[in-house]
Design a protein with these regions (language model features):
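Core segments of small alpha/beta cavity-forming domains
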Residues: 34-91
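Surface-exposed, charged secondary-structure patches
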Residues: 77-136
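Short beta-strand edge segments in extracellular beta-sheet folds
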Residues: 142-144
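Bacterial N-terminal signal peptides that target proteins for export
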Residues: 4-13
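Low-complexity, intrinsically disordered terminal/linker segments enriched in charged
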Residues: 119-123, 127, 133-137, 146, ...
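C-terminal motif of bacterial Sec signal peptides marking the signal peptidase cleavage site
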Residues: 20-23
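Bacterial signal peptide processing site
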Residues: 25-27
Length: 176
């Protein structure tokens, strides 16, 4: 009888210790918060947001920074807004600053982010297959996380006959 009581007393001591230990551990969320975001947000992962951006641009055929704001990082939106008031950037911004070519594409297909090996990455470059008539080319968008939002932070021009002054949108605006 004494042996049974000893076994149960050890068990009754073990249960509160296990509960206390589990209360002291923390769970790390899958996506960490990367600061704040001052602008509106588009729902979805990096590839989904990038595809929505290109779909919106093809449908509306406009470079209106205010309308594109939910898709752009705070820094890129500020750079584009400042550049729109600078005559040196007028040609870049009246053409298509988000593509290697001067004219807007008719179609765009963003590569899947599932091919990215590091799922915790905060900067995700995604290839974009663009098409206008019989011409096809490829560019790359850099997606970053601001707060809980995935947004475009830069465009790398890979499409051959580049109209911009540098290899990326940011470099072209910053005159690098």
């Amino acid at each position: 009888y004494k042996e049974i009581i000893m076994r149960y007393s050890k068990l009754t001591m073990l249960i509160p210790c296990a509960l206390l230990l589990s209360a002291c551990t923390t769970v790390t969320p899958a996506y960490k918060d990367n600061g704040t975001r001052s602008g509106p947000c588009v729902e979805g992962g990096p590839d989904n947001v990038a595809q929505q951006f290109y779909d919106y641009r093809i449908l509306h055929r406009s470079n209106d920074i205010t309308a594109l704001r939910p898709y752009l990082s705070d820094k890129l939106a500020t750079l584009l807004s400042d550049a729109s008031r600078d005559n040196n950037h007028r040609e870049l911004l009246t053409n298509d600053p988000f593509s290697s070519r001067t004219t807007l594409p008719e179609s765009a297909r963003v590569a899947s982010a599932s091919t990215i090996p590091n799922r915790d990455a905060r900067n995700i470059p995604l290839r974009v297959d663009l098409k206008q008539g019989d011409q096809s080319w490829q560019d790359e968008v850099l997606m970053i996380q601001e707060g809980q939002c995935w947004v475009i932070d830069d465009v790398r021009y890979l499409g051959g006959s580049v109209h911009a002054t540098a290899g990326t949108l940011r470099q072209s605006i910053e005159n690098r």
